[in-house]
A protein has these predicted regions:
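A short beta-sheet element
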Residues: 457-459, 466-513
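A short glycine-rich beta-alpha junction/loop motif
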Residues: 275, 487-495, 526-553
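Non-catalytic DNA-recognition/assembly elements of restriction-modification systems
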Residues: 333-413, 547-596
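Conserved Class I SAM-dependent methyltransferase catalytic core
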Residues: 192-263, 268-270, 274-277
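Sequence-specific dsDNA recognition surfaces
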Residues: 393-414, 430-463
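Flexible, glycine-/basic-rich loop-and-beta segments that form/coincide
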Residues: 265-380, 386
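Conserved S-adenosyl-L-methionine
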Residues: 30-157, 162-166, 173, 230-233, ...
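Long recognition/docking surfaces used for binding and targeting
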Residues: 1-21
């Protein structure tokens, strides 16, 4: 292919990347950035001809080849075929794409990927990007290093994550001491964090992605821009608060995109996001307030097994076009950067720096127009006669909102028992949600330690408890019937809400069954792998309450009908177990329903 035959080179490069992805994944367990994510990030960073781009955690070269393809298309669109101008511009971009990767084999693969994409492989180098700059490859030091005119204008990267595993954390003191984030931070009374510079305050370990974030922002030239994949928990977990504050005080956060949970499947289920950040120019003052682009990706073109998901036509047949929304997000970001008006939607919108919630929360979900509309609907009750808005934790003086203990029952769990008469049934969150008890686990209490027996007592529920799923798919509500309370242990993955007043209980059942309540719970979910809720989120959740229960009589009646239906279904399930067909066949009724 000719050097400027973009389609041919793109096809060869894509084929090679797919081949190496499959083979490396099998051999080394490497995690690769979804090509759709690469393309979106490159579009949103929008490199110009002559700008230097870098991936400091380069892997097999996905971002480098993506940058090169994007720049080559720009050259072709802005020059005539076979012209000296085109040749000159193609030569410029060939020398403008850089990569640093610690694994020697991956550097070789990245070079091959660049050759298959149409050259530009000279910038692919081996090194540890967390080392001091003077230890980098001389090629990088001369052509793409901090503090020089040749410093990178753009960094696009997906750094290694620790996943909070000790063996994946950075513990090298010689590295940690050179990073702000390698030191402890202290918070003053005003909530401002200060990072120590003392050697006595060097952390024992730090997550590599945190160090990469700092290194990337230090590396790019003033006025440069960064696109970096990070764990989703970075956006709102309190443990990352000091890093978010530092980021927002020293740089401009242009945008945040949360990625679909299947983005890196089947390699890993870690939930991820992308930060788009600009480094102020020298003497540039960061505005006190500005708009931040936010998006929540809902479609990624594949399922949890990595199988492609295509758009279907009107007849239900595949169009061959991947079903994803990353191009839509990139289009909206382009309009945002160009100052063009863009209609806010449920999943793509803007928010202001000053409007950010406590703890420098930058998770788009917390600012979703749809979810916040539900919050505003609840707050409106403060303006209605005979109504007020309060928190669920303040509804009753002796209200209890809690979850059971985390425990390990593997040594006392019995799989597929033939006799369950001396065993204790245990319900997972999904099992508790079932109207009939299909998914019962069985526990042998005679094998339990004294500590496990204490935990078993704590996992019992009381009749009338309202339970909310708090992990994975959060916000689903169920009710503790008499049978459940008398006979079952229930997973700690359900938050328990216990109230004494019957009207209040029915009212809460109806409230938690509503879309409004679900939206409020989704506003508070958090997590890097699975989404979670804590009892405190339920305690602090807003709810409208009337001065007199007669004002909510219809809602209370609806809640009571739900409770009555749950009890009736529970009794019917017990009856059919005891007197159904299994009884006629003289088979043990409980075990016939087991799906361990």
């Amino acid at each position: 292919a000719k050097y400027d035959d973009a389609d041919d080179w793109d096809l060869m490069g894509e084929t090679y990347e797919q081949f190496t992805h499959i083979n490396l994944k099998r051999q080394q367990g490497q995690f690769f950035t979804n090509r759709l994510v690469v393309n979106m990030m490159v579009r949103m960073l929008d490199p110009e001809i002559g700008e230097r781009t870098l991936d400091p955690a380069g892997g097999s070269g996905g971002f480098s080849t993506g940058m090169f393809r994007y720049l080559r298309r720009k050259v072709i669109e802005n020059s005539l075929p076979d012209s000296h101008q085109r040749e000159r511009m193609l030569g410029t971009i060939k020398d403008s794409v850089f990569l640093v990767e610690i694994a020697k084999r991956l550097v070789k693969i990245a070079k091959c990927a660049m050759l298959m994409t149409g050259d530009g492989q000279s910038g692919m180098t081996r090194g540890n990007s967390l080392d001091s700059y003077d230890k980098f490859d001389p090629w990088i030091q001369a052509r793409c290093c901090k503090g020089k005119l040749t410093a990178p204008d753009i960094i696009a990267t997906n750094p290694p994550f620790s996943g909070q595993k000790i063996e994946s954390m950075v513990s090298d003191v010689s590295i940690l001491k050179s990073f702000v984030f390698g030191h402890k931070a202290k918070m003053d009374r005003e909530g401002n964090y200060t990072f120590s510079a003392a050697d006595d305050d060097i952390l024992l370990t730090q997550a590599p992605e945190i160090l990469f974030l700092e290194r990337c922002l230090d590396w790019i030239k003033p006025g440069g821009r960064l696109g970096i994949v990070m764990p989703k928990g970075f956006l709102d977990n309190i443990s990352y608060e000091q890093y978010r504050q530092w980021l927002l005080k020293n740089y401009v956060l242009n945008g945040v995109v949360t990625l679909h949970k299947d983005t890196f499947q089947p390699d890993t289920g870690v939930r991820t996001c992308i930060l788009f950040v600009s480094k102020p120019k020298e003497d540039e003052v960061i505005p006190e307030d500005y708009k931040i682009f936010m998006a929540i990706s809902q479609r990624i073109g594949q399922d949890s097994k990595g199988n492609s998901v295509f758009i279907l036509d009107g007849n239900g047949k595949s169009t061959g076009q991947l079903n994803h929304d990353l191009d839509i997000i990139a289009d909206a970001y382009e309009e945002f950067k160009n100052g063009k008006p863009h209609q806010d939607s449920e999943y793509i919108f803007t928010y202001t720096l000053k409007g950010l919630k406590d703890h420098y929360n930058i998770n788009p979900q917390h600012y979703s127009p749809k979810l916040n509309a539900a919050l505003n609907q609840v707050l409106e009750f403060d303006n209605k006669d005979h109504w007020a808005t309060t928190t669920i934790g303040q509804l009753e003086s002796n209200i209890k909102i809690y979850m059971g203990p985390r425990w390990n029952s593997s040594n006392i769990k019995v799989d597929n028992p033939s006799d369950t008469s001396k065993l204790t049934p245990y319900l997972t969150a999904n099992g508790a949600l079932e109207l009939r008890r299909f998914s019962i686990k069985w526990i042998d209490p005679t094998k339990a330690s004294s500590k496990q027996k204490v935990f078993m007592d704590m996992l019992k529920v009381e009749e009338g408890d309202i339970m909310i799923t708090r992990s994975g798919t959060i916000g689903k509500m169920t009710y503790a019937t008499k049978d459940m309370a008398d006979n079952y242990l229930v997973s700690d993955d359900l938050v328990r809400i216990r109230v004494q007043d019957e009207n209040l209980r029915a009212y809460l059942v109806a409230y938690f069954a509503s879309k409004t309540a679900l939206s409020l719970m989704l506003l508070d979910e958090y997590g890097s792998v699975q989404q979670h809720l804590q009892p405190r989120h339920i305690q602090e959740m807003l709810i409208p309450v009337p001065d007199d229960w007669s004002l909510a009589q219809d809602m209370i009646e609806a809640g009571n009908k739900f409770i009555e239906a749950m009890e009736a279904m529970s009794k019917a399930d017990c009856e059919i177990r005891e007197h159904g067909f299994d009884k006629m066949c003289n088979t043990e009724p409980q075990s016939s329903q087991i799906q361990s």
